């Protein structure tokens, strides 16, 4: 019986094995075909790809083919496999990819703006079991054919410290924006600007200026800037560390997208600008950064910041969210900080941020060393007893730094607002005094006006009143510089350079602009219907000037052939010399933005005959007479539609 069943069992076993092998071979062939199909489809239907080596499936260390632009003849919409691309979140006919040190990143083209976008490329990982602690490196991926889809803007951001507390903990990613150029010359490298924090729109104007824009996230609030006095705890300045890691990532991977590591600019706006200023002051000496852009920063970036501990508020927050009281220990509060942070690591981040917001807790970078006095560096060299406008002691050159403010921010700074104070206010004040002294006799320059009393106290200590003579600010009115609103003066640039500094300050003055208006205009869409033609010109000018600063380290000069600005300034002047605008400006404190003097246009509001008498008391009558002559001639030319560059000769002769 058993013998007769044995062949049957063996036969069934062989049949089962054969079927299994058959299915295995079938699935293997099917998967191989699917892989080849997708690979073929990926290469065939990618009309344009940014790639760094000839073999798309391997990562080679020898980057012989530099930024090759690959074109394929077949069209995307002719493919019956379009759905396959979409299943892989690839929905555009032009897909770009770059091989980084650890993976391949897929991007997409914005044809309207002629730029390639790579979104949410991870540069570090946040340890979700310890989100207040050190981040985790991004390790290499195998096989090399794996990729990450960076073609869609997922709006990734770190959790915010203000309502509605949007964002996630594992947020350490960056976006890359660049032009789809094709070069095989390794010397063809583009300057890089690392922009910290989120922006509402696109920084396409900087890309159009020939830059590679990298927008980097960093941890904020208690997760990024927990500050306490126990150096042994790891929970300090993680937001600063995140930025330093982003800089390291850029340096390590720049060669993959034709980035010039000798020209890297760190930039930010608002709170991010304060972080830029903090890094410049505390880490700039050892970072390979070329320049800095600080837009609308507040005083928390300054070097004289006091290290205020967040210990108590973290303990209070943890207890309010359910942490039981800890026993008394020798380390006291600092031990409680550790326990509180460990407890809050497992609490919903929105709850943590919401509770801290209700407690009015503030988190800012904590200095490496606390300095109880004002910093002695003002961006234009050290101020000494022997320092005058024509004789300054040369100090070590620093990396060029560009400060920008809107008009209202500047006013708030002048009048000592506790809400907004510029991070480098000393630079502005010192520049005012030094630049004014280049055109006026120091002993005869004095300020007497109720709206400028504080400015008198801060700036004018070196000037004395002579014969009871005063210069009225309303009579002095207001001077604007090249490209009115946003361009610093050439004389100011020359002065800062000869004194050993590279600090420039722009004031954005458009419609009594407030915090963030300059950034909104810079990132506005090219076809934004809410902007007038003039506003679009102004936005393009912002991008132009910032791009020039990143590329060269100094702002636009008349040698650049920036003649179109003359026509733009004409529109600005016509708009701001209307009677109703003058009334509004007079009602605003701090109506003078004294960034003097040279540029294509030095601008006065409408000048009455009575006020013109005041100009004769300003010490340099020929200068003002020539200026008014230019002002009148230029306005006639503008009304006649004359947009030539010839009229710039007036100012070149004046100054």
From Swiss-Prot:
SUPFAM superfamilies: alpha/beta-Hydrolases. Keywords: Glycoprotein, Hydrolase, Membrane, Transmembrane, Transmembrane helix. It catalyses: a carboxylic ester + H2O = an alcohol + a carboxylate + H(+). Glycans are attached at residues 71, 89, 101, 185, 386, 449, 512, 527, 597. This is Putative esterase. InterPro entries: AB_hydrolase_fold, CarbesteraseB, Type-B_Carboxylest/Lipase. One of its GO terms (cellular component) is membrane. PANTHER family: CARBOXYLESTERASE (PTHR11559). The lineage of its organism: Viruses, Varidnaviria, Bamfordvirae, Nucleocytoviricota, Megaviricetes. It is an enzyme of class 3 (hydrolase). The chain crosses the membrane at residues 9-29. Its EC number is 3.1.1.1.
